[in-house]
C-alpha cells in the first residue's frame, strides 16, 4: 500500500492521478469557500497506486464540496457546477459539485431522515460513511 504519513504524502500521491493533479494545480480557479476534493476519487486513486493500477483506473467522478452558508440556493450550486465542469471540460471525468451548507435542505427527502445543518466542510466530511475498497 502507498505509505501516507503526512498531508504532503497524500498530495504527492493524488498528483500522480493526472486528472486530480490538474484540478489541484488549478484549485485557485475553483474559487469557492471552504472547498475540498473528497470521497471516492481520493480513495480510488490511493487504492490504485497501492495495487499497481494506473492512478485514474476505475474513477467515475470527482466530488468537490464547498461551504457557502450565504447562498443556499440550488441555482447557485448548479451555477458553480456548470462553471467548474466548463473549466475542466477537457478532463474525461464527471465533476460533481455540492454546497455542504445546503445538504440539510434535501437530505430527509433523499435518505428518509433529517440532519442538522453542517457548520463547515470539515463538519460535513466528518459524517461521510467510510469508503469500502473497490
Model features per residue range: what roles?
Residues 1-37, 42:
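Helical scaffold of the NTase/Pol beta-like nucleotidyltransferase catalytic core
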Residues 22-31, 45, 49, 83-91:
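Generic non-transmembrane alpha-helical segments
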Residues 32, 59, 92-94:
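Short secondary-structure junction motifs
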Residues 38-41, 67, 99-100:
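Short His-Asn-centered micro-motif
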Residues 42-44, 71, 102-105:
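Short, catalytically relevant binding-site loops at active-site mouths
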Residues 47-77:
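Catalytic metal-binding acidic patch
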Residues 81-128:
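Conserved catalytic core of two-metal-ion nucleotidyltransferases
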Residues 129-133:
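A conserved mid-domain beta-alpha-beta active-site/ligand-binding segment of alpha/beta enzyme cores
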